[in-house]
Amino acid sequence: MKNINPTQTAAWQALQKHFDEMKDVTIADLFAKDGDRFSKFSATFDDQMLVDYSKNRITEETLAKLQDLAKECDLAGAIKSMFSGEKINRTENRAVLHVALRNRSNTPILVDGKDVMPEVNAVLEKMKTFSEAIISGEWKGYTGKAITDVVNIGIGGSDLGPYMVTEALRPYKNHLNMHFVSNVDGTHIAEVLKKVNSETTLFLVASKTFTTQETMTNAHSARDWFLKAAGDEKHVAKHFAALSTNAKAVGEFGIDTANMFEFWDWVGGRYSLWSAIGLSIVLSIGFDNFVELLSGAHAMDKHFSTTPAEKNLPVLLALIGIWYNNFFGAETEAILPYDQYMHRFAAYFQQGNMESNGKYVDRNGNVVDYQTGPIIWGEPGTNGQHAFYQLIHQGTKIVPCDFIAPAITHNPLSDHHQKLLSNFFAQTEALAFGKSREVVEQEYRDQGKDPATLDYVVPFKVFEGNRPTNSILLREITPFSLGALIALYEHKIFTQGVILNIFTFDQWGVELGKQLANRILPELKDDKEISSHDSSTNGLINRYKAWRG
């Protein structure tokens, strides 16, 4: 992978000049000039997904110049490097191969000269056998009862991905009840334990090292709770499994290492739902549906790795994002799924994007002088319309939005879905084209009112429009289409990281707070006044000690 400062490229300089020409051009102007704009600026994937990027402040020239930037930064070479197992995560000296986890073609993928696929397939087979025993009821708890509830204990990538997918695919779930515990706040585990029965609950402890503070604190609390009912420590093995590589610690916890599901250091946490970390997904929707999820992602992997950049959906979305972030000064992107099952999708890619590309040091070790990762946020529609869309429509910030919706709903109640989709279509139209003063005044006339007498309120009803959006319409949210959609965003993030010359697959920003917390924890054990920190931190700790009694 080449380490190129994008702002020093000829393409970036050309884009800067082009931006000066484009900054006052409106989306309405672009549609007025080209009646065929939709067909030129949209594409379908596998007859499962339509991506419409026509309501953006771009022209064919814009895209051509952005493609030049991708070429000059050697995006094609970087894609080959990742897919071939090169150690592109250089700060940790690791390959980045979540694509191997869903490599349904089973073609060899080498790391240090060794094909990883036999081990990947062996873990998948183990997940299949284990999940079938749990789902069928063949696996019995310590009193001979079948499992009814599964509690996944993890944090970050060991929680966000499985939770998002199991929620998104609830229409495919079986009889097992899924629960997720992540926060070290005891409230989280306490509230989940109130809902489950020790005789019929399986706990999945998801920690590669089996040392993650939050996860192991929750796991030990779950174990203590379980043993209060079960008594004998030998019963732990019937009710706990591990997603880990630390066999010694897993065994000491009381888990049978035969029920330890491993993954590898080339699997990053926020890209790990495709691995053993996805065992909760398998238990929720069954192994065959999990394979469909992998297959959808694999299909997008093939599209990303083989399709020319001009037609490559992850690349197009990535380039458009860079255009707004670095030239228009957009600081955030909203992800707005019009599907209630997808209510954790934005939160999942909040981690996926911000932990990946929230970096201010480039691959050469230099502080950057341009924008890297955007702030990602969002909520399901139509809820967001009654919360924060006001700012998107009439605020002073530019907020590029991705609208996502299925054409076919899993719950065809009355005309609910038509009403939902009418809002989905209306919002992108409203954001793009707005409403002029003339239209507002005409609306008053149509109501028999004189606009002149209402002049004071007219400006507040004007919408400038020119707010950019992408629309992603899925045929239906299935395991396959969801897998493809997740991979679309993963590769968008990778593409942006390549071009912005940052290391996308490490996360050193997580470490400092953890180190300081480990230093502070012993100071909270007694009632002594603290003076070892700055005055603010000392003051906070000492007030905490005074109030806790």
UniProtKB/Swiss-Prot annotation:
| Biological process annotations from GO | gluconeogenesis; glucose 6-phosphate metabolic process; glycolytic process
Is Cytoplasm included in the keywords of this UniProt record?
Answer: yes
Keywords of this entry: Acetylation, Cytoplasm, Gluconeogenesis, Glycolysis, Isomerase
- Tell me one GO molecular function of this protein: monosaccharide binding
What GO cellular-component annotations does this UniProt entry give?
cytosol
What sort of enzyme, by top EC class, is this? isomerase
Residues forming the catalytic site: 355, 386, 514
> Where is the protein situated, by its record's location annotation?
Cytoplasm
Q: Which SUPFAM superfamilies match?
A: SIS domain (SSF53697)
Q: What is the documented function of this protein?
A: Catalyzes the reversible isomerization of glucose-6-phosphate to fructose-6-phosphate.
Name of the protein this chain belongs to: Glucose-6-phosphate isomerase
Species, as recorded: Escherichia coli O17:K52:H18 (strain UMN026 / ExPEC)
Q: Which gene encodes it?
A: pgi
